[in-house]
Amino acid sequence: MNRQESINSFNSDETSSLSDVESQQPQQYIPSESGSKSNMAPNQLKLTRTETVKSLQDMGVSSKAPVPDVNAPQSSKNKIFPEEYTLETPTGLVPVATLHSIGRTSTAISRTRTRQIDGASSPSSNEDALESDNNEKGKEGDSSGANDEAPDLDPEIEFVTFVTGDPENPHNWPAWIRWSYTVLLSILVICVAYGSACISGGLGTVEKKYHVGMEAAILSVSLMVIGFSLGPLIWSPVSDLYGRRVAYFVSMGLYVIFNIPCALAPNLGSLLACRFLCGVWSSSGLCLVGGSIADMFPSETRGKAIAFFAFAPYVGPVVGPLVNGFISVSTGRMDLIFWVNMAFAGVMWIISSAIPETYAPVILKRKAARLRKETGNPKIMTEQEAQGVSMGEMMRACLLRPLYFSVTEPVLVATCFYVCLIYSLLYAFFFAFPVIFGELYGYKDNLVGLMFIPIVIGALWALATTFYCENKYLQIVKQRKPTPEDRLLGAKIGAPFAAIALWILGATAYKHIIWVGPASAGLAFGFGMVLIYYSLNNYIIDCYVQYASSALATKVFLRSAGGAAFPLFTIQMYHKLNLHWGSWLLAFISTAMIALPFAFSYWGKGLRHKLSKKDYSIDSIE
């Protein structure tokens, strides 16, 4: 084969006439000054060297495709080159033909895509659409005759990767920059979570302005939390297609704008509608920041960084009544609460928009577009571009699969229920404390807000403890292959503290007992809730590693639903059951849930194999 007869110059024994020595030495692509011209004739294409079979094998690429990273695009399935977003190669280009030579073949989804382009039909069942993955080769839909006869991806396609030491790869950014971005993004989560509970420190101002009861005023909190559960349906696809930075810029910009009608709302209906939309817009901070942090750290070291993300959504709501109780008492103005919230959101909007793009698929997509322009080769692309992205795939990844998991995965549902309980209890505290410290002790909103400080202190204590848990996990990784159950140490430590906090709260809610008694319950609860969330979040990821985003979406929906529901009956519960039994009822439930992390630690693997329709966990990875 003559070099000038081929668009891509990949080297292999089957396709190259170069010498064996030359064919095993990949050459780095160097753009020319004329590379900016995109309308090149075929004989004017700038040829580039790409990876060979040997160079890929030397980097550990084998015939068996690994499970995609948790941050890989969810709209594409059965990738033949899932390491594209994490692997660095000397040339930055990997031909499909070379992958075929190694033993990687096009998958059912890519063949289906080709048939659709060619105009052929490709019917499949809903179950196949939801469950098709690398471990289901022998199932219906993956081994059909139609699939075997379908053509593979064009062998002249060249997949783009990061080059060795690529400064565009977020993993290669200096450590201080990555940790700085981690802290800033965690503050973004605190900002969003703060916004959900900001009005809880001044519900009396809502009652006074609109002449409504407390139950109606509480809806201004609940509806924003409900918005958190629906927003990911918008921002996850936007992030997959256009990147994290675009999603933050658009969503946080809308959030800032919609705080204006919240402050100026002429009636309660307008306020509630705008609060719901604020939840939808701002939810990008809750559903994408964990991914942004994971983008910047390899899987071996991202655990400690993710701990900051686990800390933020539980501390943010606590800051709401802490700050706005003083605004409510000193000014009595509801609108000022939203102006302060808008200012905080505006600052974080600017900061989040200034953080560079961290999502590897989008970075590589832009790099591929640049290389196509410089070389004139239209077949340089990412695997996501080669397979194509359809709205149907987006809907399956973002909506249908989470719903599917919620009815077919009992282990996931039980884990999500515990996360939902802890999150709901946090929002219950926002309305239990005003009853205990406001009605019993006679404190005003500003002093009631100060009672939330112990929760923050407990959460900070838990954040430090997550580093201990992470070090223990890394020790296990060095000794043997880890299991999802190894992630449960934090939950086993934190679960008793969350229950103890509620027992203390009920036992000390007497006027003759100094306020330190019930306030100290916040220390134990803050410590327990962060550890439980940190641990169970990692457990869900490891149990459903192949579809982690969908499993986490199920968690977000159930958690937000619980967080929205609990405030609606907390005050009535404390009034009907009294201050002691109101807390003890929740304490009984929390005490029963202590068994969950311990039970899963001992029997989790067996339960997953018996109760789950399929094993999605890291245990299934050879």
UniProtKB/Swiss-Prot annotation:
Q: What Gene Ontology terms describe where this protein resides (cellular component)?
A: cell periphery; fungal-type vacuole membrane; plasma membrane
Cytoplasmic face: residue ranges?
Answer: 1-182, 237-245, 297-305, 357-416, 468-487, 534-550, 605-622
Residues carrying Phosphothreonine: T98
Q: Does the keyword Cell membrane apply?
A: yes
Molecular function via GO = antiporter activity; spermine transmembrane transporter activity
Q: What is this protein called?
A: Polyamine transporter 3
Task: List all topological domains (Extracellular).
Answer: 204-215, 267-275, 327-335, 438-446, 509-512, 572-583
PANTHER family linked to this entry: MAJOR FACILITATOR SUPERFAMILY, POLYAMINE TRANSPORTER 2-RELATED
Q: Where are stretches of biased composition, namely Polar residues?
A: 1-47
Q: Report how it sits in the membrane.
A: Multi-pass membrane protein
Q: What induces it?
A: By transcription factor HAA1 in response to acetaldehyde accumulation.
According to its UniProt record, which protein family does this protein belong to?
Answer: Belongs to the major facilitator superfamily. DHA1 family. Polyamines/proton antiporter (TC 2.A.1.2.16) subfamily.
Ranges where the record places region Disordered: 1-76, 105-152
Keyword Transmembrane assigned: yes
Top-level taxon of origin: Eukaryota
Q: Which SUPFAM superfamilies match?
A: MFS general substrate transporter (SSF103473)
Organism of this sequence: Saccharomyces cerevisiae (strain ATCC 204508 / S288c)
One of its GO biological process terms is: transmembrane transport
- Name the cystine pairs: none
